[in-house]
């Protein structure tokens, strides 16, 4: 065996920031039921606010915006859809006309909420805030509320909407200046928005931040605030129960999936032990109670996929990786004898995962586990391609790298498995749609692959790794690292526009729930990989995990 085939690119990843913190958590069903009763009581008080007919549709939109930002709009999806369908019929032409007296904040909120729910309000609505020379009017430069709303709304742009790109460039420096001069409370809110606009943030994290901000608003609606707090605490309790169950590797709380005792971190000390972070990934995909099974699948499967990724990237020799790749193409327990002992743990975990899922799927849905298995076979083949590239010192073209990299993004394998827990949303038609690699699915993979590369490539190159998209771009186009990153960030921005475009397509190809799922996957990546590899250096997520999973809101 050649010496290069025996090389181990050890990473020495940081240990878990949580240990067994969540395993000891326990609560009775009565706690959750008590919260649920209180939430249901307040929900009936809030419902008339959503369904009320008003002379000015702005009042309805402002309530919907509040519900959305406070994280409770999921309770009223049908009512909100009906309201916005009606508003969209009457609003666009009115707000485009020059004779309306809507200010910047009003226009931006109408634009943002309608687009958020799939209605493509034309970007021309912002022309009234420009001078004849095409520049934004100086008169709006002191309107903090309007500037923030314009900034947030601009991230719902699609291709060709230059005015929204200009709006981001116009508002950002002004908002940075406001942040420097504002009270600590307001400055924090502005800086959170500048770091990550609401449209690109994880919904639970965004809701927690906004509840704290709204609590300081003198014009706050006390009923809405209490409703949001109680519902946040209710969901936190549910999520904490799920996480505790996962942490103990015992029977899943809904008694649907049973996991054997399997401590991957103990058996495979070189991997990143990130169960808590993978569960954050799961609630980022969907936090609502009805998706408990899908969350369990995402968290457990991501833990296993992460261990396989670390094996290919940071431990396995080329010979061992080839054996593992070949073994999983058979997907048979008999192939385990061909593997070194440490790989047998991973291989057995994978087969157990698929066996347990297969036992639980409803009759007529066996195709779902077949799709998940085939996706994983493709993933390990692509992981092995990267290992070969590194071993051979080969730097592919950017396009060749991306063809393989969209697969190693894991945004094919993770949805394929998590859909098993979404049977009311994802059927055979939806699986076929996903396999056709539509624009929104490809965009989520692009964002995942490239944002990951931007923050991880330096560490990976130091320890030994195949060229990332950054190195491939630098070599192909003869540019600096800084320039390559700038161009790749533009590709990510365009991918977001692709996602927005797909979400506003009429009629929609698939349900809004499924479209939102892919937007949420992109949001998770932005949260985890913006400016830092927070999956590897997970202590950076500790504050957000604490507020989302551990700290109850005082009511």
From Swiss-Prot:
The keyword Metal-binding applies. Mg(2+) 3 binds at residue 460. A motif (DDXXD motif) lies at residues 309-313. Binds 3 Mg(2+) ions per subunit. It holds the Pfam family Terpene_synth. GO terms for molecular function: magnesium ion binding; terpene synthase activity. Mg(2+) 2 binds at residues 309, 313. Its EC number is 4.2.3.-. One of its GO terms (biological process) is diterpenoid biosynthetic process. Mg(2+) 1 binds at residues 309, 313. It comes from the Eukaryota. Keywords: Lyase, Magnesium, Metal-binding. Its cofactor is Mg(2+). The Asp-Asp-Xaa-Xaa-Asp/Glu (DDXXD/E) motif is important for the catalytic activity, presumably through binding to Mg(2+). Probable sesquiterpene synthase. Belongs to the terpene synthase family. Does not produce any detectable product when tested in vitro. PANTHER family: OS04G0344100 PROTEIN-RELATED (PTHR31225), TERPENE SYNTHASE 6-RELATED (PTHR31225:SF231). This is Probable terpene synthase 6. The gene is TPS6.
